[in-house]
């Protein structure tokens, strides 16, 4: 994918129409990721904010570590389907202008969303929001690999690169395909880490995950025939079953983390 990456000028809701699929089928993050976040933050933990919170998969996990967590998300559909817990709230907001006082935030997280932002503006807003020694932690998971069935992996790659491909993936997807190397927060104290996120899912869950892709939503919006029933049949054959819940697909997601601290 070699399309130039534009600077977003207005919010284009790519996930509102698929917010339920996003909540139900997107991977949740493992304990290793939150342990890294925990280790990167200092002892002052009054307020964490999760920007581009989506349906709150990461937002609610931060509640264990901080007195209060606010998820900021520009899609009303995502907020309506967001995970709830006592010390978490959600607010409708773009990433580039957050209605909080300067120096009031201990941690800013961005999970699987920074590639949609106007990054130079977001970096400056992050600096404004964070207190001294506050942390900005950004991460994204890349294209998963199916590890227990080569035929299924071929189907998976064909769906990503050919059926959806450049014509339906937004240009911003290139940030993820390039392992977030072009996400460069303007903080001097910045490190990078890549971890693995292994998962097992049923064939039905895999089809649900495909339905949560923004590229799939664009594919359907363009008037194309839904290919997911055909992909399901191909996966059933690959795993030699007729039951979409009887066999597990083992997958691994690479997770690219960027850890910054305001000095």
Curated annotation (Swiss-Prot):
Cited InterPro entries: Diverse_substrate_MTase, Methyltransf_11, SAM-dependent_MTases_sf
Signal peptide feature range: none
Entry GO CC: phagocytic vesicle
Coiled coil: none
Pfam families named among the record's database cross-references: Methyltransf_11
EC code: 2.1.1.-
Upregulation: Up-regulated by Pseudomonas aeruginosa, PAO1 strain and PA14 strain infection. Up-regulated in gcsA null cells devoid of glutathione.
GO biological process, one term: methylation
Keywords: Methyltransferase, S-adenosyl-L-methionine, Transferase
Record family assignment: Belongs to the methyltransferase superfamily.
Protein name: Putative methyltransferase DDB_G0268948
High-level lineage: Eukaryota, Amoebozoa, Evosea, Eumycetozoa, Dictyostelia
